[in-house]
Amino acid sequence: MKNIAIIGSTGSIGTQTLDIVRANGDIRVSALAAGNNVALLEQQVREFKPDIVGVWSEDKAKELRVALSEFDIRIVSGMEGLIEVACYESAEILVTAIVGMIGIRPTVEAIKAGKDIALANKETLVTAGHIIMPLAEACGVKILPVDSEHSAIFQCIHGEEENRIRRLLITASGGAFRGYKREELEHVTVEDALRHPNWSMGRKITVDSATLVNKGLEVIEAKWLFDVKPDQIEVVVQPQSIIHSMVEFCDGAVKAQLGTPDMKLPIQYALYYPERRKLTSDTLDFAKMGNIIIDTPDRETFKGIDFAYSAIRTGGSMPTVFNAANEKAVEMFLHKDIQFLQIYDIIEMCMEAHKIIENPTLTDIFETEQWVYEYIEKYFNR
């Protein structure tokens, strides 16, 4: 019986992870944490009966304690509670399904506690990859990617020598606005941006997919996960979301991982790695598929990819600025405070204004995040 902990259990990745647990009889959920969706969290606790549960707000924790008073479960709150869940003693693997930089500290502490990490939280490696990867190696911990693209690359390089990789080809669907030109994006709405053609995801990542910032974040994440240079990573558009990513080797051979757009596959692969398990889901019908389309992204219109390359080449604290500015801008867009194209303007403005911190510590990273939020707030409150 494998014991797991999940932070972000009520979100898209968290709920699909629990679907995997439901379908298999050999995983026990020892610890759960969520934001403030207490109603769903209560349902999860009643079904999976973890030993410890975390919720962000102490008020929500009190509410949960009353609702679950018949259970002998420890209920914790805040960042310390999140860390306690992430490091729970009996859990062997932590699924980081939480969105945002809030996931960094729990991940660091879980690595120190010897937990393998099923990583779905992009921000952890984007902002702190230079800390996370050496720490994981020193602690003998595996970082197992859950993102479909990074899982695809991870599967393609299994059994290969890392120094034989020529380049990684990360695929993008193109998002809700594939084929749009800049003038067509001037008046798109939140509702338009949230209509992803292939994937069912959370609101923030769906907007990131529409801006292609998501691919930019994945470029930075891939650099750390697979120890490659930015010039060895290329983004291509694969609008059917059938090819999840590819690896070209030094002899010109290319391996690709194909499958239907279903996040359960990479989640399950991370949970059972290196074993493969049967998964009940749709399979590809090559006879009906027709042509597989591969195209180049319009990086002039969708600037998110180029911002990411600039951030990773600059290094230091710049990836944190890129990430934090995007987080804040997407939040503002979802609240209908700004237009879609202003997301790019905010990211660029912050990156241009920032004074680089070389080799930032965790404290530097969080202070940089705070600087970004304050800079944006001052700009819009002038």
Question: Where would I find each of the regions flagged by the language model?
Answer:
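Catalytic, metal-anchored helix/loop core of enzyme active sites in primary metabolism
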Residues: M1-R382
